[in-house]
UniProtKB/Swiss-Prot annotation:
GO terms under cellular component: nucleus
Keywords from the UniProt entry: Developmental protein, DNA-binding, Homeobox, Nucleus
Domain of life: Eukaryota
Organism: Caenorhabditis elegans
Gene that this polypeptide is encoded by: ceh-31
Its biological purpose: Required for cell specification of the glutamergic PVR neuron.
Cross-referenced InterPro entries: HD (IPR001356), HD_metazoa (IPR020479), Homeobox_CS (IPR017970), Homeobox_TF (IPR050848), Homeodomain-like_sf (IPR009057), HTH_motif (IPR000047)
Protein name: Homeobox protein ceh-31
GO BP: neuron differentiation; regulation of transcription by RNA polymerase II
Tissue: Expressed in PVR neurons.
Residue stretches of biased makeup (Polar residues): 77-88, 235-251
Region of interest (Disordered), ranges: 44-93, 228-260
Length: 260
């Protein structure tokens, strides 16, 4: 047990003077002296009284001093968001601007496509140079146009494979630009009668009557066998003849013979 310092009781004013306390602190090796220390014997003998009176900085106080809006350092969510942000930005590709063709360019492209469905590299480069376009633009337009052309051609074959779709086939020939243009360009395959094309002896197609090849030639051959004209229309109605008119005609003819 450490001995009591009697000077604390004999000269209390020495310890209450701040100047003397600072001098004593420097002479004792920088040891801290609590200004609020009590002079009770229990407090003087307890070595933990000095440490408990001074609040130590704790991690809780440090964290509370930080701004609540600032993210915590080392947080798993923060690290994951930081790592994923460059990936999300890199995976987003810039969308290419769509090419806008003029009416003249579209007309020339359509005319060229009607003559030649597939272009060689040399022909494509010449066409692009003549129209003021790039080779890639002409190539992309031809690919899209061929896709549309094949889709329109397949629609007619799908309808012909269904025996109950003859009305839909007639509507297709009237409205579908692909088949309308194709049939108008091949009018030599079909006959004409008084400029009023009709269906003569119309036969509803069945699956056995349709060629297996899915091409426009097979469709045209089937339509030619049914005597389809380039413009579908309803047949003319023949003039109606009643029995009374036939009887009157025979009577008038008999009277004319008797007069002779």
């Amino acid at each position: 047990m450490s001995m009591l310092d009697l000077r604390q009781f004999l000269i209390p004013a020495f310890f209450l003077d701040p100047t003397n306390q600072l001098a004593a602190q420097s002479s004792s090796g920088g040891a801290k002296i609590n200004l609020n220390s009590s002079f009770r014997i229990s407090d003087l003998l307890d070595p933990t009284s000095h440490s408990t009176n001074e609040p130590d900085p704790s991690p809780t106080s440090i964290n509370s001093s930080e701004s609540p809006s600032s993210p915590r350092i080392g947080s798993p969510n923060t690290e994951r968001s930081v790592n994923e942000s460059p990936t999300c930005v890199g995976s987003k590709k810039a969308r290419k601007a769509r090419t806008i063709f003029t009416d003249k360019q579209l007309q020339e492209l359509e005319n060229t496509f009607e003559k030649q469905k597939y272009l060689s590299v040399q022909d494509r480069m010449e066409l692009a140079h003549r129209m003021g376009l790039t080779d890639t633009q002409v190539k992309t337009w031809y690919q899209n146009r061929r896709t549309k052309w094949k889709r329109q051609a397949s629609v007619g074959m799908d309808l012909l494979h269904d025996a109950g779709n003859m009305a839909a086939v007639q509507q297709l020939l009237r409205t579908n630009p692909y088949w309308a243009n194709y049939l108008s360009q091949n009018t030599s395959m079909f006959g004409a009668s008084n400029n009023r094309p009709v269906f003569n002896s119309l036969v509803v197609p069945t699956s056995s009557m349709i060629p297996a090849s899915n091409s426009q030639n097979s469709l045209l051959q089937f339509l030619a066998s049914q005597n389809v004209k380039d413009d579908i229309s309803s047949p003319k109605e023949s003039p109606s003849v009643s029995p009374d008119s036939v009887k009157n005609a025979s009577v008038s003819k008999k009277e004319s013979d008797e007069d002779e």
